[in-house]
């Protein structure tokens, strides 16, 4: 029984890490985000010298 308790946090941590993934869109985010995480998108410039923007999305708890 003690062994099982020790391995649980590790499995949970791995699951959380796999949920925080980058994507180009939040459409159908249920396939890419794990509950209760939500998908957040924002625009950012590609580089300091460029005015071109790209959309970034990520799963987050906040």
From Swiss-Prot:
Disulfide bonds join 19-34, 26-39, 33-59, 41-57. Expressed by the venom gland. Its main location: secreted. It is found in: Secreted. One of its GO terms (molecular function) is calcium channel regulator activity. Residues 1-15 form a propeptide. GO terms for cellular component: extracellular region. Keywords: Calcium channel impairing toxin, Disulfide bond, Ion channel impairing toxin, Knottin, Neurotoxin, Secreted, Toxin, Voltage-gated calcium channel impairing toxin. It comes from the Eukaryota. The keyword Disulfide bond applies. According to the nomenclature proposed by King and colleagues (2008), 'Gsp(267)' comes from the species name 'Geolycosa sp (strain A267TDLS2-KZARNA)'. This species has been reclassified since that study, as indicated in the work of Oparin and colleagues (2016). Belongs to the neurotoxin omega-lctx family. The presence of a 'disulfide through disulfide knot' structurally defines this protein as a knottin. Modulates Cav2.1/CACNA1A voltage-gated calcium channels (P/Q-type currents) in rat cerebellar Purkinje cells and hippocampal CA1-CA3 neurons. At saturating concentrations (>10 nM) decelerates activation kinetics and slightly increases peak amplitude without affecting deactivation kinetics. In vivo, does not cause death when intravenously injected into mice. In rat models, through its activity on Cav2.1/CACNA1A, has an ameliorative effect on memory defects provoked by hyperstimulation of N-methyl-D-aspartate receptors (NMDARs) in the hippocampus. This is Omega-lycotoxin-Am1e. It comes from Alopecosa marikovskyi.
């Amino acid at each position: 029984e003690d062994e099982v308790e020790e391995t649980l946090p590790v499995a949970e941590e791995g699951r959380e890490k796999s949920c925080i993934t980058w994507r180009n869109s939040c459409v159908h985010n249920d396939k890419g985000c794990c509950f209760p995480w939500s998908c957040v998108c924002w625009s950012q410039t590609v580089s300091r010298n460029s005015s071109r923007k790209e959309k970034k999305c990520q799963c987050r708890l906040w």
